[in-house]
Amino acid sequence: MKLCATSSEPARAAWPLSEPALAYFPDARSASDRDLAAGAYSPGVAMEHIPVLLDRCVELLTPALTRRNPDGRGAVLVDATLGAGGHAHRFLSDLPGLHLIGLDRDPQALQIAGERLAPFGDRVSLVRTRYDGIDDALAQTGVAEVSGFLFDLGVSSMQLDRTERGFSYSADAPLDMRMDSDAPLTAADVVNTFAEKDITRILREFGEERFAARIAKHIVRRRPLNTTGELVELLYDAIPAPARRTGGHPAKRTFQALRIAVNSELDSLRAAIPAALGALETGGRIVVMAYQSLEDRIVKTEFAAATASRTPPGLPVELPGHEPEFVALTRGAERATPEEIERNPRSAPVRLRALEKVAGRPTTARRDAR
């Protein structure tokens, strides 16, 4: 296996109200707010990582990975959000000739996935990077074109399991929320040093929080805030009681917003999707699973542009050579089936979209590719 590189005690937060299950698109890849509300997740207790929509991902990507050989020889799959390596393990097991490149910014995730995927030897290359570092990762691994990309967005169960990371509002922990533990900015930095107007903007834009201004005012008045428990208590005071009784846990939007801001998640995604599309070979496929509306809008917009004709508007016929470079493999966004949700409740919020590259400009070979 190749390794590359780029650049408090658990405690239940005290809420006098019950924590209802979310009815809208909660933001979690592997442990949703619905799981938390149902008691399916206990801080400090490791959970089995059940890959979301695993069979559907295999169904969509395998044709691209077996175009040359039925065992995947000559094909490269990039798992841009490696996490615990659940999806990666399935593809490597099914296709004994496949080479997989796994990306993750979290060194703990790379360690866990590396141990899990070690039996596959040099068929696996792991790169520590955000998923917008695709071009550099491919250059480091000597790959010019990719047969398939898989993106499984959001926060992982491992990150939620580790209380000290500060991602969960169900346990008291330091206000951290960094996916890369070496990154300089933490959630505590945001709430304790940013101007009130900037905190308001973050909560409104990244959390779609309608009480953003009220919350920001309370934060500035009460800071410094150092733990998730302190922030949860503040949110209970800041959000009006009627609003706390509907729409899920009152902290979910603020925690989502801070996490997105700390990790630059949306900017990274906006750069990553075009980079992935540009690296696909003809016949290659990309699958993206999003778990909250902000991510899904970005994916939807990028995919719509990729599947649009390049013929100038107003012409009555399609110009030769101007056909769309990509075709959609899904009709809009696919959802998990009731059976899938029954087996894996974490799949309830997922929106899956997929494309295949069918024509157009060839992928530009990278100078560093061997």
From Swiss-Prot:
GO molecular function annotation: rRNA (cytosine-N4-)-methyltransferase activity
Localization annotation: Cytoplasm
GO biological process: rRNA base methylation
Enzyme class: transferase
GO CC term, one of those recorded: cytoplasm
Basic and acidic residues compositional bias, start-end: 333-345, 353-370
Residues annotated as binding S-adenosyl-L-methionine: G85, G86, H87, D104, Y131, D152, Q159
InterPro entries: RsmH, SAM-dep_MeTrfase_MraW_recog, SAM-dependent_MTases_sf
Region Disordered, annotated ranges: 333-370
One Pfam family, short name: Methyltransf_5
Catalytic activity: cytidine(1402) in 16S rRNA + S-adenosyl-L-methionine = N(4)-methylcytidine(1402) in 16S rRNA + S-adenosyl-L-homocysteine + H(+)
EC number per UniProt: 2.1.1.199
Key words, A-Z: Cytoplasm, Methyltransferase, rRNA processing, S-adenosyl-L-methionine, Transferase
Entry-linked HAMAP family: 16SrRNA_methyltr_H
Function recorded in the entry: Specifically methylates the N4 position of cytidine in position 1402 (C1402) of 16S rRNA.
Family: Belongs to the methyltransferase superfamily. RsmH family.
Protein name: Ribosomal RNA small subunit methyltransferase H
Organism expressing this protein natively: Mycobacterium sp. (strain JLS)
Name of the gene this protein is made from: rsmH
